[in-house]
A protein has these predicted regions:
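Short beta-strand segments within Ig-like beta-sandwich modules, predominantly Fibronectin type-III
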Residues: 108-116
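Short acidic/polar inter-strand loop motif in beta-rich domains
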Residues: 139-147
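Short beta-strand elements
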Residues: 146-162
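N-terminal, intrinsically disordered, polar/charged segments of Gram-positive cell-envelope systems
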Residues: 6, 18-75
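C-terminal motif of bacterial Sec signal peptides marking the signal peptidase cleavage site
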Residues: 13-16
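Short edge beta-strand/loop segments characteristic of extracellular beta-sandwich folds
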Residues: 82-90
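Surface-exposed, short loops/turns at beta-strand junctions within beta-sandwich domains
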Residues: 123-131
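Short proline/glycine-enriched turn/loop motifs at strand-loop junctions of beta-rich domains
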Residues: 91-96
Length: 162
């Protein structure tokens, strides 16, 4: 009888000690996948590119738009972590993805029809007081490492809200 009890307790101890290891392995694999997923989304800003193509970028704020060279203002409250700004993309090639950058940092990509309205999230440095640039870029074969076929920008400024 004692042998059965000792054997039973030994089995329980072995099973109990083995389970957390599997859990840790699963957690580490999950973290690895998250890191790899963020690497895939890295798109480098095309340095030295000049305005090309017929696409147009328009920033829309409650203060106005960037149409006709105007520079609209976004008022940022003191403890804001994320601020959205409306963006209108037009006249881009509809068969290509349009990559959007804020201050040369990749934020998102869109499939643009004749005119597409969307929002861009301003974070961290883009919330600092000053002038900022939103850039829309299209690449040959939708490959960010390829040739730039459309490159257009719009400027806005941020100021602290009173």
């Amino acid at each position: 009888m004692k042998k059965f009890i000792i054997t039973g307790l030994s089995v329980l101890l072995l099973v109990g000690c083995g389970a957390p290891q599997e859990k840790e392995d699963a957690q580490s694999k999950q973290e690895e996948q998250v890191v790899n997923a963020s690497d895939e989304n890295m798109v480098v800003f095309p340095e030295g590119a000049m305005s090309i193509g017929e696409g147009k970028v328009k920033v829309i704020t409650p203060d106005g738009t960037s149409e006709n060279g105007n520079i609209p203002t976004v008022f940022i409250k003191k403890d804001t972590l994320i601020q959205q700004v409306e963006l209108e993309l037009s006249n881009f090639q509809s068969d290509k993805e349009t990559f959007v950058f804020v201050d040369q940092m990749y934020t998102d990509k869109h499939q643009v029809t004749s005119t597409t309205q969307t929002t861009v999230q301003l974070k961290e440095k883009a919330l600092e007081t000053g002038s900022h640039t939103i850039t829309a870029v299209q690449y040959e074969n939708n490959d960010p490492k390829g040739k730039v076929i459309s490159f257009n920008q719009a400027t806005f400024e941020t100021k602290p809200a009173s």
